[in-house]
């Protein structure tokens, strides 16, 4: 599977917002609903939103009795938004139906997932629920332990099987009807995964596919050589030392991937994305969430970068996922990457907008008011929360994020093969554990970096196309193709920073007779640098900088070191983004999240002093000069603060910025 070179060809969503629906909207064409559509569409236009995305009526087949009315509502929404040049994308879950099985589940569902818009069948009616002649209970996944219908504890839902041809035909017919009824501009199909994790599915279609594709029989649940320890969450089940189980992991991904391919065949000239908002950790194997295997049939990439809780201030934890998704989008013909942020109050909406600007991606502002402990009575509509940031951007700092070029000094490898084969080192650490640790330390040291994924790692020409060093940390699984490319890169003077183990298993997860690292070390390549395999911190990076192995373009010389700094090139212009790491959450006094996520974020405060900061920037090769700069932020409106610029010679420029009273974000341009 190769990365895509064909350029992205659809509309580019830059300022997205959720079109939040409520149960009363199913009463369309009631005059109240029609007027509400008109009012909100005008609000979206005034907020500078270019793309609205449906948010509600989510578990779509729970509304199969009301599709005519629902589609009439959506057509009305499309028509009204199109008057303002705003695109409208649908967004729904295709393979879940809400079926709470106990009173506790029932009340939990109605407390934690009200934003779905809930109208599920009662237990008696559920037996007869169907669409296009397909009874829902006949197309559900089956539990591997007893053959009963699978169940998602996260969503109190039953799940349709991605391999069941009746479900696939039902979904296909629904999509054809939807596009006939509604002039949708694009689509996000959610839950293209398996929320039963490894507890499902043992239906005949899945077992037959396992036999056809891998020549294997699915073992009984009692076979611990295959299923491993099943006492924990089903995402943790499975014995990765068994190649048959590793094939089962791939089977689950293949099943979802083929479903996505079918959906794409129906969409025609419309972009498709799915909810695959994380890429790195191994537990995603159980959920069959694997964007790198899905990307061939997707057009847009969504990254779910933050929520509404007080923990949102710890934004550095989210960056690794955000930037690897951005790299995937870049290798889908430079498709837009979209950062989804959930907001309750003005500050969290501003934070989501700021994160998107800092990462150089499109912003999707949304909310999860259906997951709040109660209605505080002061909740704004999402376009009202988003308008100040969008309008400031349009007026003072318009940037096409999809055209920006990231400036970086290091390539950080995240090798999908490690995750897929269940690799852990002797300390039990995943490859992703070390990768995400590098991401965090690069934020703290202002080293520019990008991700290098498994496909690029197997391509010597792409490795040699840049002179930035490559970091390989805890990369236990390495394919023969990847190893060959790495050797060619080193033989041609490339630099590799390596923390062992490396290549103790092959690309399919089988143990090698001898780790590949031994051959590399014996070859004594000048560009191979071995580092401690336990420590990823500022001291480690400082040593690599001191030795000239990493050559950062940004070097702070004065002021507090609490600002994260990124440089991006827009056409012939350099832009510097700064984002505060020293922020503290101000929680709402009573409002909490329903899924044990803690207090809702009400506001933030900066814990640094806001003193002037100075950086020496190496502009060699990226700009002839960098001067006449201003510092701006939505927090100071139309004011442009002067930036002191000193030309130090040798393509180095010293810039001094005054971030006084800036809580979160600013830009130098």
Question: Which stretches of residues belong to each language-model region?
Answer:
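Catalytic domains of carbohydrate-active enzymes, especially glycoside hydrolases
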Residues: 32-60, 181-184, 298-301, 352, ...
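Aromatic-lined carbohydrate-recognition surfaces of secreted/lumenal glycan-active proteins
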Residues: 19, 89-94, 188-191, 228, ...
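Active-site-adjacent "subsite" loops/lids of carbohydrate-active enzymes
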Residues: 28, 90-182, 225, 234-249
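Mature N-terminal, pre-catalytic/accessory segment of carbohydrate-active enzymes
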Residues: 1-99, 108-110, 169, 406, ...
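The substrate-binding groove and active-site-proximal loops of carbohydrate-active enzymes
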Residues: 17-32, 55-71, 152-172, 239-257, ...
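Hydrophobic targeting/anchoring helices
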Residues: 2-7, 55-58, 99-103, 190, ...
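A conserved amphipathic helix/loop scaffold
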Residues: 347-349, 461-462, 473-668
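Short, acidic/polar
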Residues: 26-44, 167-178, 283-294, 348-353
């Amino acid at each position: 599977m190769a990365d895509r070179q064909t350029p992205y060809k659809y509309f580019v969503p830059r300022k997205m917002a959720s079109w939040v629906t409520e149960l009363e909207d199913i009463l369309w064409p009631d005059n109240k609903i029609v007027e509400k559509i008109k009012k909100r569409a005008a609000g979206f236009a005034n907020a500078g939103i270019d793309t609205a995305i449906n948010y509600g009526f989510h578990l779509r087949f729970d509304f199969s009795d009301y599709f005519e009315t629902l589609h009439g509502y959506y057509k009305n929404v499309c028509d009204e938004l199109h008057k303002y040049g705003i695109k409208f994308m649908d967004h729904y879950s295709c393979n879940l139906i809400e079926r709470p099985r106990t009173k506790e589940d029932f009340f939990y569902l109605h407390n934690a997932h009200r934003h779905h818009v809930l109208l599920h069948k009662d237990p008696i009616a559920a037996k007869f629920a169907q669409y296009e002649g397909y009874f829902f209970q006949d197309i559900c996944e089956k539990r591997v332990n007893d053959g009963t219908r699978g169940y998602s504890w996260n969503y109190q839902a039953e799940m349709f099987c991605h391999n069941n041809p009746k479900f696939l035909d039902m979904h296909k017919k629904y999509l054809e009807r939807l596009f006939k009824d509604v002039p949708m501009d694009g689509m996000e199909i959610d839950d293209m995964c398996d929320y039963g994790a490894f507890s499902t599915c043992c239906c005949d279609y899945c077992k037959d596919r396992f036999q056809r594709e891998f020549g294997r029989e699915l073992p009984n649940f009692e076979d611990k050589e295959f299923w491993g320890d099943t006492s924990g969450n089903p995402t943790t089940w499975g014995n990765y030392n068994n190649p048959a189980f590793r094939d089962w992991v791939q089977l689950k991904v293949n099943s979802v991937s083929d479903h996505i391919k079918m959906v794409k065949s129906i969409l025609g000239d419309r972009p498709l994305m799915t909810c695959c908002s994380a890429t790195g950790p191994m537990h995603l194997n159980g959920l069959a969430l694997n964007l790198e295997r899905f990307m061939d049939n997707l057009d847009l990439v969504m990254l779910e970068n933050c929520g509404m809780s007080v923990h949102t201030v710890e934004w550095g934890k989210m960056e690794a996922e955000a930037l690897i998704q951005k790299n995937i989008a870049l290798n889908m013909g430079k498709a837009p990457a979209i950062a989804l942020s959930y907001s309750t109050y003005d500050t969290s909406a501003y934070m989501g907008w700021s994160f998107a600007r800092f990462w150089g991606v499109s912003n999707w502002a949304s909310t999860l008011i259906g997951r709040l402990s109660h209605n505080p009575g002061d909740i704004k509509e999402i376009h009202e929360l988003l308008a100040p940031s969008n309008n400031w951007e349009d007026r003072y700092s318009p940037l096409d994020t999809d055209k920006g070029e990231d400036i970086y000094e290091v390539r950080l490898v995240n090798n999908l093969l490690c995750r897929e084969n269940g690799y852990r080192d002797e300390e039990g650490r995943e490859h992703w554990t070390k990768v995400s640790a590098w991401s965090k330390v690069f934020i703290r040291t202002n080293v520019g970096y990008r991700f290098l994924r498994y496909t690029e790692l197997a391509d010597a020409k792409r490795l040699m196309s840049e002179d930035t060093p490559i970091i390989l940390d805890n990369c236990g699984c390495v394919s023969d193709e990847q190893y060959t490319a790495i050797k060619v890169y080193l033989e041609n003077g490339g630099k590799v920073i390596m923390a062992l183990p490396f290549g103790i298993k092959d690309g399919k997860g089988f143990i090698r007779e001898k780790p590949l690292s031994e051959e590399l070390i014996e070859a004594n390549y000048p560009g191979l640098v071995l580092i401690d395999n336990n420590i990823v911190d500022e001291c480690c990076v400082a040593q690599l900088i001191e030795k000239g192995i990493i050559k950062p373009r940004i070097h702070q010389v004065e002021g507090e070191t609490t600002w994260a700094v990124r440089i991006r090139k827009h056409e012939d212009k350099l832009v510097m983004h700064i984002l505060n790491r020293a922020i503290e959450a101000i929680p709402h006094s009573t409002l909490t999240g329903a899924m044990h996520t803690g207090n809702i974020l009400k506001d933030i405060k900066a814990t640094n002093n806001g003193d002037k900061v100075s950086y020496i920037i190496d502009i060699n090769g990226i700009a002839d000069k960098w001067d006449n700069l201003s510092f701006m932020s939505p927090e100071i409106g139309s004011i442009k603060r002067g930036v002191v610029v000193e030309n130090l010679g040798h393509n180095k420029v010293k810039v001094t910025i005054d971030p006084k009273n800036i809580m979160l974000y600013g830009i130098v341009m």
